[in-house]
Curated annotation (Swiss-Prot):
Key words, A-Z: Ligase, Phosphoprotein, Pyridine nucleotide biosynthesis
Reactions the enzyme catalyzes: nicotinate + 5-phospho-alpha-D-ribose 1-diphosphate + ATP + H2O = nicotinate beta-D-ribonucleotide + ADP + phosphate + diphosphate
GO molecular function terms listed in the Swiss-Prot or TrEMBL record: nicotinate phosphoribosyltransferase activity
Single biological process term from Gene Ontology: NAD biosynthetic process via the salvage pathway
Family assignment from sequence similarity: Belongs to the NAPRTase family.
GO CC terms of this entry: cytosol
One Pfam family of this chain: NAPRTase
Record has Ligase as a keyword: yes
General function of this protein: Catalyzes the synthesis of beta-nicotinate D-ribonucleotide from nicotinate and 5-phospho-D-ribose 1-phosphate at the expense of ATP.
Protein name: Nicotinate phosphoribosyltransferase
Top EC class for this record: ligase
Organism the protein comes from: Herminiimonas arsenicoxydans
Length: 397
């Protein structure tokens, strides 16, 4: 079968934006990323080891093509020196290892952050597609197409509802857990054709380039987590990360992620300066209604018109959930909805809940204190307890 990954642009936009920011601010950072499967697969993922090794061998032969680099240069927030770096960039096979750990698959990328952070999305795509190849492909695609048509029907019926102050906008965040590259492309093309009034873009930079769509994304947890090890006082790591982001992008890419140490701790750092500079906030764990109300109350306390800001929701969303959140918030603020697995891998086969997370930076543990049970990741319980103490973040049961 052909390789799963065939071009390096088929990655989330926020991978490039974080990559650029970290290359400029902390090019010397040494990091460790680790693959984790959060749920029980239908068969042991360790059986995929040899195939994953082969796919990674191929990945490390790829380079950015001239037309891909030209596209990145066309994005106003991409700097010429970063694209020049990508011109000579190659993944180094020595930085990533694959091992069977009983029934589990252990994948670790260890090395300079600017050389290993790009592995994440490709590893997830590779594992997910290899895993799903053992299921009935034709039956899966038939069911996936039926479900996609049902989503389009839901969207068209939703259009008959009373108009709200702000429009409903959703976008594709599905590259990391897609059924396959071909199916992901079919989903994006179909939505762009059938419901362009609602479907506003994709995080997949390759598909955005190919179909003239808006590439979507700003930052992920790893960007903020890395600052836990960058020499600032731990209590100040979020402020340092946000400040460097502001200096890098000067008003572009203005959606801040809030749940690295919980929403309450984030808002304590998100003062008038940041609240004015950033265009909005992204929710990725915890109760979305409670989170959104906290965000709006925070803007009100700072005397900022929430109608000029945007709340982006991206935590395990489907369309009915997005509609419900839209109805709740759309008359008070701009909204946006990033839908991933439910778009690119809704086939009837239970999806793997897989991630590849930053676990250490510069020899120190880093952690995310999620607002949802099961999403907190850290190997060092002592550091985790200290982080909870510093940010007054209780364990989520």
């Amino acid at each position: 079968m052909p390789p799963i990954v065939n071009n390096l642009l088929e990655n989330d936009l926020y991978k490039f934006t974080m990559w650029q920011a970290l290359l400029h601010s902390h090019p010397e950072a040494q990091t460790e990323y680790e693959f984790v499967c959060r749920n029980a697969p239908a068969y042991p993922l360790s059986e995929l080891k040899a195939d994953v090794e082969r796919e990674l061998d191929h990945l490390c032969t790829l380079a950015f093509r001239d037309d891909e680099l030209l596209y990145l240069r066309s994005l106003r927030f991409m700097k010429s020196d970063f694209v020049d770096f990508l011109t000579v960039f190659r993944f180094q096979r020595k930085f990533i290892t694959v091992a069977a750990d009983g029934p589990a698959l252990r994948i670790r990328a260890i090395g300079p952050q600017v050389h290993v952070m790009g592995f994440e999305i490709f590893v997830l795509c590779i594992v997910n597609e290899l895993y799903l190849r053992r299921f009935d492909q034709q039956a899966s695609l038939t069911e996936a197409r039926r479900r996609l048509q049902e989503k389009i029907r839901l969207l068209k019926n939703f259009g008959k509802e009373a108009t709200r102050k702000n429009p409903f906008e959703f976008f594709d965040f599905g590259v990391r857990r897609r059924f396959s590259a071909a199916w992901h492309e079919e989903v994006v093309v179909t939505l762009a054709r059938e419901v362009p009034q609602y479907f506003t873009g994709t995080s997949n930079v390759h598909l955005a380039k190919k179909y003239g769509l808006t590439p979507i994304g700003t930052m992920a947890h790893e960007y903020l987590q890395a600052y836990q090890s960058f020499g600032v006082r731990l209590r100040d790591f979020q402020k340092a990360a946000l400040e460097d982001w502001v200096q890098e992008y000067r008003g572009d890419l203005g959606i801040a992620l809030t749940d690295v140490v919980g929403m309450d701790a984030f808002l304590a750092d998100f003062d008038l300066y940041f609240a004015k500079l950033f265009d909005g906030l992204r929710h990725d764990s915890g109760d979305p209604i409670e989170w959104g109300e906290k965000a709006l109350a925070h803007y009100a306390r700072l005397r900022i018109d929430a109608g000029s800001k945007r709340l982006v929701f991206s935590d395990a969303l489907d369309l009915p959930g997005a509609f419900s959140l839209y109805r709740h918030f759309a008359d008070r603020t701009l909204t946006g909805f990033g839908i991933g697995t439910n778009l690119s891998n809704d086939t009837g086969i239970p999806a793997l809940n897989i991630v590849m997370k930053l676990m250490a930076c510069n020899g120190q543990p880093v952690a995310k204190l999620s607002d949802s049970a099961g999403k907190t990741l850290c190997r060092d319980e002592t550091f985790l307890a200290y982080l909870r103490q510093v940010f007054h973040h209780p364990a989520v049961k």
